[in-house]
């Protein structure tokens, strides 16, 4: 009997994992692109001599992220929903991607700040204090790995949900079809 229960639980979990396989794939791709973007920022000097412009350059990641969400939800539409995905299904897929990206965000932040640009926080703290925008204590409390992990979690979740909703709207069918497979 125990074997049957364990086997049934495995089948249910396997089904759930297959249901979100596409979202997981795209969340991994998005995390890798984030690390590549951080490497690009570092190589272009936005973590060193151009650090005062880094915030503006970082905002440009919205364009590749929007494209990635579009590709991800289009993949879900074509390969899971057979070309017919309504807004709700696309939105749920976008939310799932956002949650998975958020789960990866502590790891990507750690890699970024320990390996790609280990002196980043020191430079931001120095810039903030020199420009008299923050006191040393304020800068240290704002520019550290823990704070950036929390910022990436909240920002990634809110950004992902909004972009997922927009992309789901773009990809929804032009006419309402009541035969679309629902979740």
Language model: regions and residue ranges:
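Membrane-helix interface/capping segments
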Residues: 70-89
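Functional transmembrane-helix hotspots
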Residues: 107-131
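Transmembrane alpha-helical insertion/packing segments
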Residues: 2-5, 11-70
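Hydrophobic alpha-helical transmembrane segments
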Residues: 135-161
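Short, charged juxtamembrane terminal tails flanking transmembrane helices
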Residues: 19-20, 171-183
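Ordered, amphipathic secondary-structure segments that act as subunit-interaction surfaces
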Residues: 83, 90-111, 115
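Alpha-helical transmembrane spans of integral membrane proteins, capturing the lipid-embedded, hydrophobic core
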Residues: 23, 27-35, 62-66, 94-98, ...
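Alpha-helical membrane-inserting segments
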Residues: 33-44, 68-76, 104-112, 162-170
């Amino acid at each position: 009997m125990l074997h049957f229960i364990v086997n049934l639980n495995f089948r249910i979990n396997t089904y759930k994992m297959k249901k979100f396989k596409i979202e997981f794939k795209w969340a991994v791709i998005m995390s890798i692109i984030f690390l590549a973007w951080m490497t690009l920022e570092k190589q272009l000097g936005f973590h060193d001599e151009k650090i005062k412009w880094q915030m503006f350059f970082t905002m440009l990641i919205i364009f590749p992220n929007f494209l990635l969400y579009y590709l991800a939800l289009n993949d879900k539409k074509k390969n899971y929903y057979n070309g017919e995905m309504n807004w709700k299904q696309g939105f749920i897929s976008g939310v799932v991607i956002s949650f998975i990206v958020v789960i990866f965000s502590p790891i990507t932040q750690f890699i970024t700040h320990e390996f790609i640009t280990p002196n980043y926080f020191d430079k931001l703290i120095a810039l903030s204090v020199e420009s008299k925008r923050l006191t040393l204590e304020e800068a240290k409390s704002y520019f550290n790995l823990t704070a950036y992990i929390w910022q990436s979690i909240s920002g990634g979740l809110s950004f992902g949900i909004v972009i997922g909703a927009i992309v789901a709207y773009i990809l929804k069918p032009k006419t309402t079809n009541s035969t679309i497979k629902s979740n």
